[in-house]
Amino acid sequence: MSHLFSPPLAALAASPLLYVYSPERPGLPLAFAPAAALAGPGRVEPPQKPPYSYIALIAMAIQDAPEQRVTLNGIYQFIMDRFPFYHDNRQGWQNSIRHNLSLNECFVKVPREKGRPGKGSYWTLDPRCLDMFENGNYRRRKRKPKPAAGSPEAKRTRVEPPESEVGCDVGSPDLATALPTRAPDRSQSPAVGTARPALLPWPGPEPRDPDADLTVQGAGAVASGQLQRPAHHLGSPLCPAPSGSPKGSKSKSFSIDSILAVRPTPASGAEAPGIPKPVPGALGSSLLAASSGLAPPFNASLVFDAHVQGGFSQLGIPFLSYFPLQVPEATVLRFH
């Protein structure tokens, strides 16, 4: 701008001022003012975070102290004086400073001497870590060289097993006697306190007592003579009819087996030989046949009453009412 303006204007152009130009007069400035005045107090940018780690900040504070040692409050004060960014949010970064002091081996805690004013211990740098930064540059730390395999430092840095693993070492003489030589095989021996489920036997049909068989008295039962044997009722097995059993026995007292063993005689040749013929005046033989092959709770005894023709009474457990009966209309049932 020196070739356009006079020397006083050239000096103004070199100064840190802001110039305001008009669109009507593009070559001439209308006004000028300092940049800080135009920016105003509300537009001041906040301070930037310094590009240093917390370890570098602590090392700066220690090396800046006259005796190369400083208290914790001295470290806080040094950081806030040098870096305005740490004026705010003190609790956050101060906690980080304390953690780095306690976790890093390069910082050594020195107790305060007796009689020295003040409180708190001092912090200093380990003599082996004085040159941990490259050429005094606090932005870059030197990498620690790996110790040799046989050096004492490598033995010190070796990770020792935890106490739980050391305590469980079987090679020790005390634990070798305490531990069993071999664990029991679960597949061969059952576990203690466990029992196999016991199999409950299902009650089968008990043998019939001949004394508990049904006895029939009366002329009606003898006259009918022929009772049918059920072909397919409840799937109960029936004993085959004996060959020497009489067909028309007129005895007043006989067993139920002789009644069940009697086969009906076909009335005509047109009827099938295997199909039984129903008898109107007969008692439901299906009930009697089924009761002989069922479990013991279903066994019962029926006795005809001699005083009442066609009537009978029950002995034993209650008579099951859902069994089909074929009883003539004149028959009277009486239950006790």
Curated annotation (Swiss-Prot):
Protein name per the record: Forkhead box protein L1
GO molecular function, one term: DNA-binding transcription factor activity
Main location: nucleus
Organism: Mus musculus (Mouse)
Pfam family name, one: Forkhead
UniProt keyword annotations, A-Z: DNA-binding, Nucleus, Transcription, Transcription regulation
Annotated PANTHER family: FORKHEAD BOX PROTEIN (PTHR11829), FORKHEAD BOX PROTEIN L1 (PTHR11829:SF204)
Gene field: Foxl1
A GO biological process held by the record: regulation of Wnt signaling pathway
Deletion phenotype: Deficient mice show postnatal growth retardation secondary to severe structural abnormalities of the stomach, duodenum, jejunum and decreased intestinal uptake of D-glucose and levels of the intestinal D-glucose transporter Slc5a1.
Protein location: Nucleus
